[in-house]
Amino acid sequence: MKFGILCNGNIFQQWQLETIRQLVTGGHSCDLLIVNANPLPQINFRDKLINYPYSKLIYRIWFRFMMRPEAKRPSNICDLHLVIPEIRCYTIKKGYSEYFNEADLKQINAHKLDFILRFGFGIIKGGILNAAKYGVWSYHHDDDRKYRGVPTGFWEIWYSDPVNAAILQRLTDKLDSGVILRKAYFKTINHSWQANLNNLLQSTTEWPLQVCRDIENGITGFLSVRNSPESAIFRLPDNLKMTRFLLKVAFNKLRFHFRDLFLTEKWNIGIIPIPIEKLINPGSYEIPEPQWLKINNKRSVYYADPFGYFVAGKINIVCIFLLY
C-alpha cells in the first residue's frame, strides 16, 4: 500500500519514525511527505512576558526540562534512507481548523495514496480527509471515552485509573468522532509520568502496519464504524494541580520501590470451564469463578503463562514454574 505523511518537517519523534520504519519494512511504500509550510507566529519578548500563562508555569517547566521520554526523542527521517517526494503546503485557517487549498489537494490526489498518517499540522478538515483511499489516520494516546484533551498519560495517574488507552482513528470532519481502526488498553505506570507516556507511545507503533494487513486480507468491517465519545475535554494542569500531581507521583514511587524491595508477586493459574469465545464476547450469562491450581508451598512458588491441551479427555497444562 502507498501512504503519505502529514508532518512539520524532516524531524519526527522517535516513535513516529519507528511507525514509518515498520510500514516500510512491512512492504509498504512511503510516497509523499506533506510538509507544513505555515510560518510560526512572531511574538515579541514584551508580549510574551505579558501574555505568558503563569498559572501553568510549573507544568511548563516540568514538561520542558524534566520530561525526557525516549519515545519523543527527535529523529530525522533521513535516517531511514528513503527517497520521498514532498509537497510544502500552506493551509487556510478557519477558527481552530485548517483547510488545504485546491491546488495542493490536486497534487496530493495525483499520488493516489492509500492512506495518510498525521504526524503534523493541527485540526485538519475538508478535502484532505478524502485525499487518500482510506483517509487520514491519526493517533490519540488516551482513552477517548474518558480523557480527551491534554496532556497525554497525565490524567490517568491523577485519577488513579489503573489503565491507559490509545486509539488509531480515521479522521472525519467532526472532531473526536473518527472511525476507530485500533484501540488497546495498557497498565498505568503511576509512579512515573515519563515511563507511562513512553509506554503508551512505543506500544502503538505497529498499529498502522496491522491495519494494512487487515485491509489486504479483506478484513474491512471496522473501516465504517464511527466513534462518538462524550467525555469531557481536559486542559493543561494549573500550578496547584501540578504540585499535587508531583507529590502523588513521588508517593507512588516510594510505594513502588517499597513493594519491589520487601514484597513478592504471587502468580497462579485458574481454569474457567467455558469456551473462550464467551470471555472474548461476554453476553448476559454469568462467568463462573476460576478454579485455581493448588500450590503446596505458597510462600516460594508461582505458576504463570499457561497453555492448556486435552489428552484422553483430561486437561493438561504447560506453564512456567518458578521456585524461589
Which residues does each PLM region occupy?
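One-carbon transfer enzymes
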Residues: 1-324
